[in-house]
Each structure stands twice: as structure tokens, then as C-alpha cells.
């Protein structure tokens, strides 16, 4: 315990003009529809309670008891099928205000693995704090948070190289930059050993003692960790059977006939009571918990933080991004030498009418530039994947060139050359869509966490992601196409090369867009099946395996949905159209020495420009759909 406290490096600094908040919930009931008959399953049943500032509160209970559901409701992430009320300082919670007043850190610490600890914290500060705050002040804030959470030695270490405990602490630090008075944690010790778990909870306790309302869903804590909590709520079958100080739990349980053995872990004892493994009067516990919650809500005694405690235990900084422009000016006038601050007095910012507050701390353009820089850094820093993609495009281009070597000008090998041109599209599609299916879900989880905690807007992230991917999207097909194109002796006219290159780039964008769409819409395992399966019809109606005019009439509408068809038509027209001279015939008879005759034979439907317009239309449609799915994912996470 002493070693853990030594890691915290408490900083004595001046107070932050912010008022502590007490969070109350009353008669919360949550139901979900569990089958086609619209039968409702009760997850939470009329639960009430109060979380006080300055105290570290644990929510404990067996699996399926409703702990995480309660946390999501209180954090504002879930509203569908929920009744009851949530109060902040005995006033109804205002959703817009609560986004600035709270943050929620999930069980899985979703962070970008290619950024360093320092970059992660600094980008969080840039996104969550006003642009009026200087870089020097932000650097000071980042440094103080690193000191507070014991991350100074890992500042130049990539997230992928951090230990589990360091990742957990970093996930706390990125939210800490805005000094939220209410913090929610879903199983912050999951996946950690006992020492790392103790360090994390010790940090949370210090944050609470700085004046925050800190609430944790916890699962089977050790006795030492359990003793760090001030208050406890025990949830069983959707009901709260205990809510109050940890020190009173054993006595309350004993009064209801549940006796805790000597030298027994009180957390295990509470779980056994909640799981009905110990015989006693559960109804008595429910009644006591109800009476306690009603008394607590009525009195709603806001804890006043002891002066000595607030000076000893630090929280975050005085330049909270949730403050208005007036409070930002006030921050700039204050001494910036100490920026890690406990919550204390009434904030002028909260006196400003809600409609005058900004939705985000910085402008949309500023969000876009920061996110674009971050995405570009991650894209080019992932050299293993980027290099592998480039090497594979080059090697496959060479292999394809060797297989179809110098057939591009041979009339007798025109069918084989057509297969080569189709294979270009086939390789580009799978080489650019499949890797994205595996890599994007991790980034999407980071986006979801940051967006739910009000870091930035969806459009800013969306456009930064698209633009950051463009350089690699253009470089890979360019390398592949140029190598294979000239090795196979295709026409070297500059306009033809440019036209084929344009089709390849557009097809790459389509492919990566579909990979992003599958990655965000499905689990990775399911996406790996769905994407190839959905591609099969596109290949069938491409015009390569069967001519369009030979399709049954009822199949014609489906042929218009094949992006492979438009890409194939565009390339084949570029290579054999535009008055190309006669091909070389090395055999006694060649049917298609005239390229125009071959184009007529295979049944070209549209001009090159029309095919490019259709491909561009597919790009617009796919990326609009991607935006809609991302927006739906955010909406669903709040339900």
C-alpha cells in the first residue's frame, strides 16, 4: 500500500473554481425486449441511490445482476426502456451539461496502439481543451497528469508496448485533462494482476478525495482493494440490497441474518449474499436499502472536501474544456505554474445559460486538423502493414507480368489479356478491402469511446480518416498497375496509362470503403465471411464470365449493381478502344486483329466517362453508407 501511494506523487497546487457534484438516481427501472413476442425482461427494478463527491463508490454484484446497465444509464449512454430520474445536485440531469460534467471509461481501454503515451495525452488535451490555452500550458497539464498517474517513465513508449496497468491509467489520464467532476469506470481492474489492480484503484481513490464523484463497477476485489472504497452498492437480480458506507455493510447484513465469518473477504461475502448462497432475510435488506436511498436523496448532503485533503490529493487541471469563453479568459489570467487541480468552489461556468455553451471545446476545422494529423501519423507509423501492402502489390505485379508476359499486343492472346485486365481489379479489391476489415474495428472502438465522451464530432473524424488513407490508397495500386501493365506490353500511350490508373485508384477507394463498412458494421469474424460472400454476385455480373446480353431478362437489374462490371468495362475500353491500331497476329488466323471488333463482340454498354461516373457514384454511396453506420453505432450505444 505504501509503495502504491509513493507512485502517486501528490502535487500541492491551488484550487480549481469548480463545485463538487452529487449524483442521485431515483426509481430507475430498465427493461429489454428478449424475444419475438415482445416480452420484456427486467434488468433493473426500481433502484435508487446517491453517489457523493469526495468518495470512491463501488457497484458490486454477480454477473448479470445489472451493474453495467446501471452504470450506462447513469453515464447517459442508455435511455431505451428506462424509467426513473437522475439528479445532479438534486436537480434533473441536463443531457448537454452532463456531457461536460462526466466521463465514462469502459472495461476495454480503447486506445490507438501506435501513438506514444505523451502523444495520446497531448492529443486529448488538444481536442478537449480550448485552442486559447497555449501549448505550453497543455504540456504542463500532460506532465502533471503523467506524474499523478505514474506514467512519466512511459511517456515515450507506444501504447502497444505498455503494461496492462499502464494502459488502464492512460485511459484515465486522457479523460482527466478536462477535470470532470463525475467519473464512471466499468471494471477498471479487469485483466490486471493484484498489484496493478491496487495501483489503479489507489489512483481512483486519490481522484475521489480531490473532490470528484468516482463510481466503479468492480468484480471480485481483494480485501485490500475493497478497503480502498468509501461507499458500496450491492446489486442482486436487478435490485439494490445494500447502499451505504463499506464499513457498515457487515453490520447491516448481520441484522438481516447474514453473518460474515471472521477473517473473510467482505467483497466475497457480499457476492455470496447477492447470489443467494447464504440464507437470510433478503426482504429486510431490500427494505433497509430503500430507506437509506430515500433518506440520502432527500437530504442530499453535498460533501464538503476538507481543505487539507484537497491540498494533498490532486485531480486534473483548471483549464477544463467544458468551460465557456468567459472561464477560459479567467484561466489565461491565472498563474499556470500549477495545473493539476481538485474540484472545490462554485464555478462561474455553470452559471452561464446552456444555450450559450459550445457543443465541443474547439471548432470543427480544428478537430479535423488534429484528427487528420493523428490518423496520418498512425497510418505511416504502421510501417509493417504499409510496407507489407506495398511489397505485396509490387510482387504480385511482377508475378502477374511474368505470367502474362508480352501478351498485350497479341491478337491470338486477346482472351488471356482480358483475363489479365480483370485480374487487376480482382487483386486490387481483395488486397485493399480485407486488411481494413481486420484493422479498422480497433480504431472504431477508439472513435466510439472518444465520441461518446464528447471529444469531437463525427464529421471531423470521418473526413480526417478518409483523407489520411488517400496517399496509401493511391500509392499501392500505382505500383501494382505500372509494373504489371508495362511487363505485359499493354499500349504505352500516356492517356491510356492515365485512364487505367484512374480506374485502379477509384477501385481501390471502393475496396477500402467496403472494408471499412464491413469492419464497422460486423464483428471481424463475421465481416471476413460477409465481405467475400457479398462480392461473389458482383463478380458474376461483371461481364467477364458471361456477357450482359446473355443474362436472363430477370437478372439484368442486378448487373447494374456490379462495380466490377463498370471497372472492367472502363479498363477494357481504354486498352482496346480509342482507335487502337491492329494487333499483331503470330498465328495463321486471328479473329480479333481489330480491337474495335473485339469490343463489339464482348458487348460494351457504356462509354469510359459513364463507367467512371458510375464508379464515382459507388464511392459516394459507400461512404455515405459508412457515415450512416458510424452514426447508427453511436446512436445505438446510447440506447
Positions of PLM-derived features:
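Topological signature of polytopic alpha-helical transporters
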Residues: 1-41, 45-48, 53, 62, ...
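Conserved ABC transporter NBD signature motif
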Residues: 49-52, 75-76, 82-100
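Q-loop/switch helix immediately C-terminal to the Walker
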Residues: 104, 108, 113-130, 141
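Conserved ABC ATPase signature
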Residues: 158-162
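ABC ATPase C-loop
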Residues: 175-176
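Catalytic Walker B motif of ABC-type/P-loop ATPase nucleotide-binding domains
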Residues: 183-187
Amino acid at each position: 500500500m505504501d509503495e502504491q501511494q509513493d507512485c502517486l506523487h501528490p502535487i500541492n497546487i491551488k484550487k480549481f473554481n469548480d463545485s463538487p457534484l452529487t449524483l442521485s438516481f431515483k426509481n430507475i427501472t430498465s427493461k429489454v425486449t428478449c424475444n419475438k413476442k415482445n416480452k420484456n425482461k427486467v434488468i433493473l427494478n426500481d433502484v435508487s441511490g446517491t453517489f457523493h463527491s469526495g468518495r470512491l463508490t463501488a457497484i458490486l454484484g454477480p454477473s448479470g445482476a445489472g451493474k453495467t446497465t446501471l452504470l450506462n444509464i447513469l453515464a447517459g449512454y442508455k435511455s431505451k426502456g428506462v424509467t426513473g430520474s437522475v439528479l445532479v445536485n438534486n436537480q434533473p440531469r441536463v443531457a448537454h451539461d452532463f456531457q461536460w460534467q462526466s466521463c465514462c471509461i469502459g472495461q476495454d481501454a480503447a486506445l490507438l496502439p501506435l501513438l506514444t503515451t505523451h502523444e495520446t495525452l497531448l492529443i486529448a488535451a488538444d481536442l478537449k481543451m480550448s485552442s486559447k490555452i497555449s501549448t505550453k500550458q497543455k504540456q504542463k497539464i500532460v506532465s502533471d497528469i503523467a506524474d499523478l498517474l505514474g506514467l512519466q517513465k512511459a511517456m515515450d513508449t507506444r501504447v502497444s508496448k505498455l503494461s496492462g496497468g499502464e494502459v488502464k491509467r492512460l485511459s484515465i489520464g486522457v479523460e482527466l485533462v478536462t477535470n470532470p467532476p463525475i467519473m464512471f469506470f466499468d471494471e477498471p481492474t479487469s485483466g490486471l494482476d493484484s498489484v496493478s489492480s491496487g495501483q489503479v484503484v489507489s489512483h481512483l481513490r486519490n481522484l475521489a478525495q480531490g473532490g470528484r464523484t468516482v463510481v466503479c463497477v468492480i468484480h471480485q476485489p481483494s480485501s485490500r482493494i475493497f478497503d480502498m472504497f468509501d461507499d458500496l452498492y450491492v446489486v442482486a437480480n436487478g435490485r439494490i440490497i445494500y447502499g451505504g458506507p463499506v464499513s457498515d455493510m457487515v453490520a447491516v447484513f448481520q441484522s438481516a441474518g447474514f453473518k460474515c465469518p471472521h477473517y473473510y473477504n467482505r467483497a466475497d461475502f457480499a457476492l455470496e449474499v447477492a447470489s443467494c448462497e447464504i440464507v437470510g432475510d433478503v426482504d429486510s435488506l431490500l427494505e433497509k436499502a430503500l430507506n437509506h436511498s430515500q433518506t440520502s436523496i432527500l437530504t442530499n448532503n453535498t460533501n464538503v472536501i476538507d481543505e487539507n485533503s484537497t491540498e494533498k490529493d490532486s485531480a486534473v487541471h483548471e483549464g477544463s474544456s467544458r468551460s465557456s469563453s468567459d472561464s477560459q479568459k479567467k484561466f489565461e489570467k491565472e498563474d499556470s505554474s500549477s495545473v493539476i487541480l481538485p474540484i472545490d468552489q462554485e464555478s462561474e461556468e455553470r452559471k452561464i445559460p446552456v444555450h450559450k455553451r459550445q457543443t465541443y471545446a474547439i471548432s470543427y476545422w480544428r478537430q479535423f486538423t488534429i484528427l487528420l494529423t493523428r490518423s496520418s501519423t498512425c497510418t505511416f507509423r504502421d510501417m509493417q502493414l504499409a510496407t507489407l501492402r506495398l511489397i505485396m502489390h509490387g510482387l504480385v505485379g511482377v508475378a502477374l507480368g511474368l505470367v502474362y508476359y508480352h501478351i498485350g499486343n497479341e491478337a491470338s492472346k486477346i482472351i488471356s489479356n482480358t483475363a489479365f485486365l480483370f485480374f487487376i481489379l480482382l487483386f486490387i479489391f481483395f488486397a485493399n478491402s480485407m486488411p481494413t476489415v481486420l484493422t479498422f474495428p480497433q480504431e472504431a472502438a477508439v472513435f466510439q469511446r472518444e465520441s461518446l465522451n464528447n471529444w469531437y464530432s463525427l464529421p471531423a473524424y470521418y473526413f480526417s480518416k478518409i483523407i489520411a488513407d488517400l496517399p496509401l490508397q493511391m500509392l499501392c495500386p500505382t505500383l501494382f498497375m505500372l509494373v504489371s501493365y508495362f511487363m505485359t506490353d499493354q499500349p504505352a500511350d500516356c492517356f491510356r496509362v492515365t485512364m487505367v490508373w484512374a480506374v485502379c485508384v477509384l477501385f481501390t477507394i471502393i475496396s477500402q470503403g467496403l472494408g471499412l463498412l464491413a469492419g464497422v458494421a460486423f464483428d471481424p469474424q463475421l465481416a471476413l465471411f460477409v465481405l467475400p460472400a457479398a462480392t461473389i454476385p458482383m463478380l458474376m455480373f461483371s461481364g467477364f464470365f458471361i456477357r450482359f446480353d446473355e443474362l436472363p431478362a430477370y437478372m439484368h437489374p442486378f448487373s447494374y449493381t456490379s462495380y466490377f462490371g463498370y471497372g472492367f468495362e472502363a479498363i477494357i475500353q481504354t486498352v482496346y478502344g480509342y482507335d487502337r491500331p491492329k494487333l499483331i497476329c503470330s498465328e495463321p488466323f486471328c479473329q480479333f486483329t481489330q480491337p474495335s471488333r473485339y469490343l463489339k463482340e464482348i458487348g460494351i454498354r457504356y462509354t469510359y466517362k459513364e463507367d467512371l461516373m458510375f464508379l464515382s457514384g459507388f464511392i459516394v454511396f459507400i461512404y455515405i453508407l459508412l457515415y450512416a453506420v458510424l452514426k447508427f453505432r453511436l446512436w445505438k450505444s446510447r440506447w
